[in-house]
C-alpha cells in the first residue's frame, strides 16, 4: 500500500460539489409528457454514450418533481439551450409550478409525446431503454429516435454557478469573431436557479 493510499479519506460532499462547479457544462431542459404527466427540469448531467445506436445518458435525482412522470412515461426530450434561454433555464431549475415552466417557451410535440422547445439549439427525442441507480440519482440510458437542430444562438454554458455563453465557431473561410463578441464568452451572469451539475428541480 502506498503512502497516498493509506492516507485516503472519503471526499466531503460539499467539497465535491464545489469541485464540480468548476466544470463548464452545456445546459439542457429535459421534458416529458404522457400518461405519467407533464414535467421538466434543467440539467447539465447529460452526455453521449454511443452513436451506434445513438444513445444519451441523463441523470436525475430521485427526489426530483419530474422523476415520477419521466419514469412512468418512459420517454423524454433533451433540449440543448443557447444564449437568451437563461430565464427558462432558471424556471425549470427551481420550484416553479409545471404550468408556469412550460408557459415560458414555445413547444412542439414530438413523435414520442415529449415536448421540444422550438428554438433550442438541438432537441433529441428519446426513449428510456435502461436505468441504473447510483447514490441519490438514477442514470437513464436514452435511445435517440429523432434529432432536430433549429436554434442559431451561441451555446449556453453553466460554470461556477453562473451562466456563460460560448460563441459559435466561424464557418470555414469566414472572418474571425469580433473581439467584443469573443470577450462576451468570458463574462458571467448570475444563475436564476440552483446549481445544475448535481441537482435537478
From Swiss-Prot:
Annotated GO MF terms: FMN binding; FMN reductase (NADH) activity; FMN reductase [NAD(P)H] activity; riboflavin reductase (NADPH) activity
EC number: 1.5.1.42
Catalytic reaction equation(s): FMNH2 + NAD(+) = FMN + NADH + 2 H(+)
Gene Ontology BP term (one): nitrogen utilization
Short name of one Pfam family: Flavin_Reduct
Entry superkingdom: Bacteria
Uppermost EC category: oxidoreductase
Keywords, sorted A to Z: Flavoprotein, FMN, NAD, Oxidoreductase
Location of the region described as Disordered in the Swiss-Prot/TrEMBL record: 169-201
Family: Belongs to the non-flavoprotein flavin reductase family. RutF subfamily.
Function comment: Catalyzes the reduction of FMN to FMNH2 which is used to reduce pyrimidine by RutA via the Rut pathway.
Protein name: FMN reductase (NADH) RutF
Source species: Methylorubrum extorquens (strain ATCC 14718 / DSM 1338 / JCM 2805 / NCIMB 9133 / AM1)
UniProt lineage: Bacteria, Pseudomonadati, Pseudomonadota, Alphaproteobacteria, Hyphomicrobiales
Amino acid at each position: 500500500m502506498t503512502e497516498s493510499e493509506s492516507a485516503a479519506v472519503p471526499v466531503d460532499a460539499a467539497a465535491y460539489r464545489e469541485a464540480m462547479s468548476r466544470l463548464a457544462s452545456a445546459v439542457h431542459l429535459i421534458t416529458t409528457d404522457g400518461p405519467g404527466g407533464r414535467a421538466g427540469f434543467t440539467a447539465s448531467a447529460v452526455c453521449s454514450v454511443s452513436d451506434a445506436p445513438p444513445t444519451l445518458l441523463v441523470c436525475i435525482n430521485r427526489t426530483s418533481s419530474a422523476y415520477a412522470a419521466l419514469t412512468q412515461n418512459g420517454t423524454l426530450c433533451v433540449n440543448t439551450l443557447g444564449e437568451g434561454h437563461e430565464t427558462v433555464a432558471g424556471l425549470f431549475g427551481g420550484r416553479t409550478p409545471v404550468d408556469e415552466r412550460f408557459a415560458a417557451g414555445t413547444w412542439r410535440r414530438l413523435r414520442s409525446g415529449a415536448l421540444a422547445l422550438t428554438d433550442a439549439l438541438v432537441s433529441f427525442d428519446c426513449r428510456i431503454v435502461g436505468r441504473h441507480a447510483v447514490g441519490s440519482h438514477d442514470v437513464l440510458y436514452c435511445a435517440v429516435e429523432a434529432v432536430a437542430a433549429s436554434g442559431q444562438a451561441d451555446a449556453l454554458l453553466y460554470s461556477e454557478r453562473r451562466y456563460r455563453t460560448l460563441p459559435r465557431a466561424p464557418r470555414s473561410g469566414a472572418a474571425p469573431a469580433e473581439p467584443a463578441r469573443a470577450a462576451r464568452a468570458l463574462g458571467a451572469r448570475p444563475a436564476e436557479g440552483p446549481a445544475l451539475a448535481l441537482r435537478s428541480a
